[in-house]
């Protein structure tokens, strides 16, 4: 399923496309707190799990509350799973809160309390699929 080099646009075309996308983003990007400089990988991770099938407008206040209450994976891992479900609020699909709690425990147990930077390690966490792993790697660690 590879792409042959002949099928790719010329490098000048790619550079123009890249520039156009960045220009568009600079004008139209929404100011999301989890995209702000200084947001921890944990903050990015939590936002990506919360945003699965949930409108951003609902995610933002809950995300802020979670970051205040559980600023690290170890903080969430130490809480009762029921606390995570209750704090999930109106986000829907409350099993995601349980998966997030399980992921926090896995990070604490297997990754020294840190969000792993490798896509393969992210995929091994509960509740993390291809999109979430790629988004966390990109936005938290700058992996293209």
Residue ranges and their predicted role:
Residues 5, 11-15, 19-144:
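Catalytic cores of DNA base-excision repair glycosylases
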